[in-house]
A protein has these predicted regions:
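Helix-loop junctions and terminal segments of transmembrane helices
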Residues: 86-101, 306-331
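N-terminal membrane topogenesis motif
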Residues: 2-50, 106-110, 244-266, 518-529
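Hydrophobic transmembrane helix module of multi-pass membrane transport proteins
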Residues: 119, 123-268
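Signature of the first transmembrane helix
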Residues: 32-93, 127, 131, 157, ...
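Transmembrane helical elements of multi-pass membrane transporters/channels
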Residues: 36-51, 217-225, 229-233, 246-322
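Short runs within selected transmembrane alpha-helices of multi-pass transporters and secretion channels
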Residues: 47, 55, 86-93, 153-172, ...
Length: 529
């Protein structure tokens, strides 16, 4: 499970969205989408923080090479979940949001039933394929025959994971974020506690035993969470039979086919990319252990830190899908343009703050978290990429909410194919530098294509001068933070953080980048109006 409704003063909304529940807790007064995003963000940051501590523990227990093997196993699991869902989670979110926006709970139930049935078929078939192919994948791709047991665990639990993902889409679509958050928090914390128990009680120091403990801990707790979500949905939709005449199967197919094609291509190419990295690093002159250590350093240690603050944007991206779907169903073009403007502007400020902060703090963060210099150096190199990575998360959510799944298929195909070709050609010759170059180029191209399509669909004209001012504020605040020096790790880290935050806020106000209307809107959004 996982990821702004603007104030009425700025953009009126249909009175339907202000209904208060009188039965089953279904019709609820909707808070701002930004407020819901902040709620999800706070929870996700807490859970990501706990997970990062757990990741540090794993890296010290099994080493960077062991973390690399664990990342490859989880890559296979992610690919299996993608094929098992086949676009049904986003389709469920989109269709439930449309039916909820028209106040048709029988339509919501019909949408959920169709998506669950289709997801069950896809996940069972995918799980069976993974179950029977586990030994071949472990030998050929993972180069670790003992990892086949981990893959079999993943295969058996796949239908359950996909069911939980589809059920969670209902709560996001209907604006019931708090209920989803409660279940998510309990499930994630229970998962970490159970995993730690399994690690300490039964698992040794081998990566395969560690991976099995991680998978089993998540499976048991996700089963309980799935049951809890199912019970809540049954209570909400009690007395509402699936409605006929809505052509729900056709509508679902129209969404799932392009979504599944996009996800298949993206996941397939991403999986190939992930397996190409250790292969290319070995061809560049390193041993298998050294290649897995470099891969684990980037994928399991640096990238989680780089994307840690993105919890807000992924939550916002998830919430934008149903919000824009409702606005599009109502024909409210003005609200779509307003959301586009606010999301792009606030997203750029947030991404700029994170990029500048990471650039100024990277070496000390690497030492503070992992006690190593290499993660900090890689983090500083990648920090400018935060701008395109974070903004792409917002743009992707808006495109899905506007029904632009086919465009997402096209852009993902182009950029992922570029990624694989660049890695295949450059990685054996230039090693990790080639991977960093490929990562930067393909993500920039994807963001540029997606943004171009979003602007064409919404009719929004971006303010280039605003973007330039925001980037200059980021650079100025980062430069100011470099003036802090000291003898110890934590004094420098805390001093640079404080000076960067003060400088960034001051420059935003001084240059007029953060306008009074923005602060008023943020204040009202924080209150949830």
């Amino acid at each position: 499970m996982g990821a702004f409704k603007i104030t009425n003063r700025f953009c009126p909304v249909h009175p339907l969205h202000k209904l208060i529940s009188k039965r089953g807790g279904v019709w609820v007064r909707k808070r701002s989408i930004f407020y819901n995003a902040l709620l999800l963000t706070g929870v996700n940051l807490l859970l990501r923080g706990v997970s990062m501590v757990f990741q540090v523990y794993l890296s010290r227990r099994i080493g960077a090479a062991g973390v690399g093997l664990l990342q490859l196993v989880l890559t296979v699991e992610t690919a299996a979940i993608t094929f098992g869902l086949s676009g049904t989670r986003v389709a469920a979110m989109y269709l439930c949001a449309e039916e909820y926006g028209r106040r048709r709970l029988d339509g919501v139930r019909s949408a959920l039933a169709h998506c669950l049935c289709f997801g069950a078929v896809c996940s069972v078939l995918t799980g069976a394929a993974l179950l029977f192919g586990s030994e071949w994948i472990a030998d050929t791709w993972l180069h670790e025959p003992l990892a086949s047991g981990c893959l079999r665990i993943t295969a058996l639990a796949l239908p359950l994971r996909c069911c939980a993902a589809i059920l969670s889409a209902y709560f996001t679509a209907c604006g019931q974020v708090r209920r989803l958050v409660r279940v998510d928090v309990i499930e994630r914390l229970s998962c970490l506690a159970l995993t730690m128990f399994l690690l300490l009680a039964f698992a040794g120091d081998s990566p395969t035993e560690t991976c099995s403990a991680v998978l089993l801990g998540s499976i048991f707790t996700e089963a309980a969470a799935c049951a809890a979500l199912g019970v809540m949905i049954c209570r909400d939709l009690r007395g509402h039979s699936p409605r006929a005449g809505l052509h729900m199967g056709q509508r679902m197919a129209k969404l799932c086919l392009p979504l599944a094609a996009s996800d298949y291509l993206r996941s397939g190419l991403r999986t190939i990319e992930q397996f190409l990295i250790p292969w290319g690093l070995m061809r560049a002159g390193g041993s298998y252990e050294a290649a897995m250590a470099e891969y684990g350093m980037f994928g399991g240690m640096v990238f989680p830190v780089l994307m840690f603050p993105a919890a807000f944007l992924y939550a916002l991206s998830d919430l934008l899908v149903p919000e824009l779907a409702r606005s599009r169903a109502e024909g409210n073009r003005m609200r779509v343009q307003h959301l586009t403007q606010k999301c792009l502007r606030m997203g750029l400020l947030f991404a700029g703050a994170v990029a500048g902060g990471l650039f100024a703090l990277a070496p000390w963060l690497g030492q503070a978290i992992y006690g190593l210099d290499t993660p900090g150096r890689l983090l500083r190199i990648l920090s400018p990429m935060v701008l395109s990575l974070y903004m792409d998360a917002i743009v992707d959510g808006m495109l899905k909410g506007l029904g632009e799944q086919v465009s997402c298929v096209r852009y993902n195909t182009i950029t992922m194919a570029m990624d694989v070709l660049l890695l295949r050609a450059l990685l054996p010759r230039f090693g990790l530098a080639a991977y960093l170059l490929s990562f930067a180029v393909t993500h920039l191209v994807n963001f540029a294509l997606s943004l171009r399509r979003l602007l064409a669909v919404t009719g929004h004209t971006p303010d280039i001068r605003y973007a330039v001012r925001a980037l200059l504020c980021t650079a100025g605040a980062a430069a100011a933070a470099f003036s802090v020096f000291g003898p110890g790790l934590w004094p420098i880290l805390l001093g640079r953080t404080a000076l960067f935050a003060v400088s960034f806020a001051g420059l935003l106000r001084l240059t007029g980048t953060l306008e009074r209307s923005d602060t008023v809107w943020l204040r009202q959004a924080l209150r949830g109006h």
